[in-house]
């Protein structure tokens, strides 16, 4: 069983927006990425410059941050259990990636300002940014995306959208905690440094590459996390 995985973080300063943009475009050092494969990453949506994209959206909506620590953008990391990608062709990975941008565009419209597909780490994933402008013109992360109910609804709707790829949502109302993006990266960083063969999704290929098969350390590490996550949920819903 493979899970759809979505994490949401807060970018509450222009410095953090710039840092996220640098991470996405690999203009800053990224310890868990393979520099030899960074040219395989793809900007799926929006401009390369994340800071400019956020500023342009705020200007277009006529919104100015009211507080010094206002959340300027929500940062998404969208991925799936590592074993989901094991037998996928480059075309199938790109189809999955396109599903991420379709979901975000339908849900957040013009507030969805950037998405980047990373293929230089052990497991493909998409980083995306959404400016949290409410329908009544406020910059309000909690009302727009945050809060327990909003995040629960996001997880449910995202998993439904990913059902087409055979991905499932975890059990709702469980004791399993939502992990922040930093926690998610921290738990898998050591395993993600395991070298993996290169894959390029752009050219046509005649057969599926086995580019994740040597990343056994990564797969086993994350499978164990997913299993613990599922066990905790199942325990929580026992009568």
Residue ranges of each PLM-predicted region?
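N-terminal nicking endonuclease/strand-transfer module with a His-rich metal-binding environment
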Residues: 1-239
């Amino acid at each position: 069983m493979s899970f759809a995985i979505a994490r949401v973080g807060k970018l509450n300063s222009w410095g953090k927006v710039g840092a996220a943009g640098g991470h996405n475009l690999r203009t800053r050092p990224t310890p868990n990425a393979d520099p030899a494969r960074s040219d395989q990453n793809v900007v799926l949506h929006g401009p390369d410059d994340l800071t400019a994209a956020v500023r342009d959206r705020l200007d277009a909506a006529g919104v100015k941050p009211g507080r010094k620590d206002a959340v300027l953008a929500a940062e998404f990391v969208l991925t799936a259990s590592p074993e989901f990608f094991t037998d996928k062709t480059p075309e199938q990975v790109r189809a999955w990636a396109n599903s991420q941008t379709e979901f975000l565009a339908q849900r957040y419209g013009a507030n969805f300002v950037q998405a980047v597909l990373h293929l230089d780490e052990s497991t493909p994933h998409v980083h995306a940014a959404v400016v949290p402008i409410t329908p009544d013109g406020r910059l309000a992360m909690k009302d727009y995306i945050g809060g327990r109910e909003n995040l629960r609804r996001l997880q449910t709707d995202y998993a439904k959208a990913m059902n087409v790829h055979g991905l499932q949502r975890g059990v709702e109302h469980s004791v399993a905690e939502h992990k922040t993006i930093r926690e998610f990266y921290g738990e898998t960083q050591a395993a993600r440094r395991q070298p993996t063969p290169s894959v390029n999704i752009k050219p046509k290929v005649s057969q599926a590459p086995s580019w994740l098969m040597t990343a056994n350390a990564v797969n086993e590490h994350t499978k164990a996390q997913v299993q613990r996550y599922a066990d905790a949920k199942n325990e929580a819903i026992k009568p």
